Amino acid sequence: MNTARELAQLANELLRCRETPDYPLALNGLQVDNRAPVTRIAAAVDCSQRTIRGAIDAGANLLVVHHGLFWGGLQSLTGAHLDRVRALLEHDVALYSAHLPLDAHETFGNSALLARELGLTPAGGFARYQTIFCGVQGTADLETTSLVTACDAFARRHGGQAIASAIDPGRRTRRWAVVTGAGINSDTMREAVDCGLDTIVTGEGPHWSAVDAAEKGL
């Protein structure tokens, strides 16, 4: 059986963690080690007391997350932060985190996998950040409402729901982009217009983005 360090090294190489830029002080890789060989792996978006407890209850001793414990440099071990670390250590659960390396990977990345889950075929990158693309884009020819329905069905399988800006009757999606997480800002909106996109699927967007999107043909 592999140790958490061995599995982390494999994941780091696969996701190209060392070469992939990320937000300042984001810590990608093995954040908390353990003692025993890894026998079961759990995965979640966030490292929270709930997801840690879920991993423990499932008998996992490696938790893989997108949003790890450490973001802003030095952090004191107090409050909820201490509770999370204590639970990992007391139950010998290792923690591995991959942020932008997991968003940006062209095969295993969040954006690429979500696009394929929705029946879309990525043909290039979108949402440029330094030397990488956090999202994907491509072409299609389908009713926008059918894409929203597919998004909603996917979201509901995971306890959520899809929210769409105003859609005119008969509107079709021909040039799309998928960027997971908080993928909409002034830069990505401008990039979408420059690329001639008509539809963007994202994890979350601010209120103003729905207003701007309608005025920009998105």
Model-derived regions: residue spans:
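Hydrophobic structural segments
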Residues: 1-218
